[in-house]
Amino acid sequence: MILSGKEILKHIGEDIIIEPFSEERINPNSYNLTLFNELLVYKNDTLDMKIPNETEKLIIPEEGLLLEPGKLYLGRTNEFTQTNKYVPMLEGRSSTGRLGLFIHVTAGFGDIGFAGYWTLEIFCVQPIRIYPNTEICQIYYHNIDGEYDLYNSGKYQNNNGIQPSLMYKDFEK
């Protein structure tokens, strides 16, 4: 079952952490998260799962940054989130989707216990100008049934910035 906006609000600061938090961004069953002012792009057209792929940092100026179709941009939320009780999920807002802007390719599912900034896998179907601090996506929370363990992977936990793929670490086991 998905938590209502009123339930999210009740649990802020205890079972749900969103920092910074603004009550105006609560929706009926989600909370709007905003876009940080930096992006990463991969330097090479061909990527390799078994190695760290080099990235380049782009700054999103106040006047906006034009994104190109067919290119993956990695961004992040301004907000740090954490919950040890609910399953966090991330989705694009319908307003961004109607502009042909995807904010995640496959990683919209979070784990109980994840603490950090959400890395956004941004992709557009046509050129689009984006702006920093835009309400770009929404987080919502599911209850979980049964016993569970908290997320304990060191790969992305407590990140401080945009996280490129760390899949190469899976091959080091």
From Swiss-Prot:
Family: Belongs to the dCTP deaminase family.
Gene3D superfamilies found in the cross-reference section: 2.70.40.10
Pfam families documented for this protein: DCD
Keyword Manganese in record: no
Enzyme class: hydrolase
Oligomeric and partner information: Homotrimer.
Catalytic activity: dCTP + 2 H2O = dUMP + NH4(+) + diphosphate
UniProt keyword Cell membrane, yes or no: no
Catalytic residues identified in the record: E121
Organism ancestry: Bacteria, Bacillati, Bacillota, Clostridia, Eubacteriales
Binding site for dCTP: R93, S94, S95, T96, G97, R98, D111, T119, L120, E121, Q138, Y151
A GO molecular-function descriptor: dCTP deaminase activity
Keyword terms: Hydrolase, Nucleotide metabolism, Nucleotide-binding
InterPro entries to which the protein is assigned, alphabetical: dCTP_deaminase, dUTPase-like_sf, dUTPase_trimeric
Transmembrane segments: none
Function, as annotated: Bifunctional enzyme that catalyzes both the deamination of dCTP to dUTP and the hydrolysis of dUTP to dUMP without releasing the toxic dUTP intermediate.
Organism of this sequence: Clostridium botulinum (strain Alaska E43 / Type E3)
EC number from the UniProt entry: 3.5.4.30
Name of the protein: dCTP deaminase, dUMP-forming
Pathway note: Pyrimidine metabolism; dUMP biosynthesis; dUMP from dCTP: step 1/1
One of the GO BP terms on file: dUMP biosynthetic process
Site (Important for bifunctional activity): G108, F109
